[in-house]
Amino acid sequence: MLSRQPSRILLIMSKPVGLRAAVTAAVVATTAAVSFAFPAPVSAAPASGGVRYVALGDSRAAGPSLDRTAQTNGCGRSNLGYPTLVAQGVGAASFLNLSCTGARTEHVTNTPQPTSMGVVLPQIERMPSDATLVTLSIGGNDINWPTLVSQCYATAPGGDAGCRNDPAVSDRALSALAGLGPKVWSTLAAIRMKAPAARIVLVGHGGIFGDRGCWPNLPISNADAVWAKGFFAMMNGVLATAAATSGTEFVDVTAGAEGHDACAAPGQRWFEGREAGPSSSPLHPNAAGMAHMASRVLGVVR
């Protein structure tokens, strides 16, 4: 039985402490302080009908703009998103992609989501209870990360916004991450309650920012780019902690992605910047990035 969830992430931050150190302290404090019971997975014999896979989440799973399929549903779900590739990789007997561009945690659990083609029910309501594999990509819209990072954008080539040295920027980032962990934990708990025998995999964020900026695709100084990259590393720390404390699995999609950020050459780029091409979305993984994400997930579930 679910007894209680972590009510907050403790923030420990002194004046010149960087974002990485501050959020690392927050994650460690959360892990040490949280005491709760998470619904354990129900032991079940291997499904005779094969893997029954359900993909949940936001645009990082949906893959808007990757192909024409994404234009035929209000959620922007593409056949080139990592869920389709994972379904093929595991030889899924059934596959249901419920991810929806713009989704926040509440749209997965209990709140209908408006789309360009009407309102869709909460994703969990449409998820079959006999699912044996569930992936989840979530969190980016909860914290509205583009707004947080946009404070680092320079207004001219060669400029430096200096967001890395702005306490207000760090405070906003820390506040956003502080509220994210409990939301993701609750979402994982709701998934477990709906599909008690499922293997649940939480897929991480990041990959867009590397160690440098590139005008105008990522109009950010090299030093601030490192800050932004660190922000996503800390976001992944929060997600990984939610997974670890809920008995689910976490996949870091930035592993193996060095040199494939939005400032990489077009043929090496897996994640788009602000100026994406017609077959990808700004600030999202492109088809190559989705293939990488699928490979990372398959490395865990196969």
Please describe what each predicted stretch is.
Residues 2-45:
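Secretory targeting and sorting signals
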Residues 41-52, 85, 116-135, 140, ...:
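Short amphipathic alpha-helices and their capping/turn segments at secondary-structure boundaries
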Residues 45-102, 153-157:
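Serine-esterase "nucleophile elbow" of acetyl-processing enzymes
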Residues 52-57, 61-63, 94-99, 132-137, ...:
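Structural recognition of the beta-strand scaffold that forms the well-ordered cores
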Residues 64-66, 117-176:
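Oxyanion-hole/transition-state-stabilizing segment in secreted/luminal serine hydrolases
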Residues 102-121, 262-277:
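Charged, often glycine-rich, active-site loop that binds/positions anionic groups
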Residues 133-136, 158-192, 201-242, 246-250:
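Conserved N-terminal glycine/acidic-rich loop preference
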Residues 206-302:
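Catalytic His-Asp segment of secreted/periplasmic serine-dependent ester chemistry enzymes
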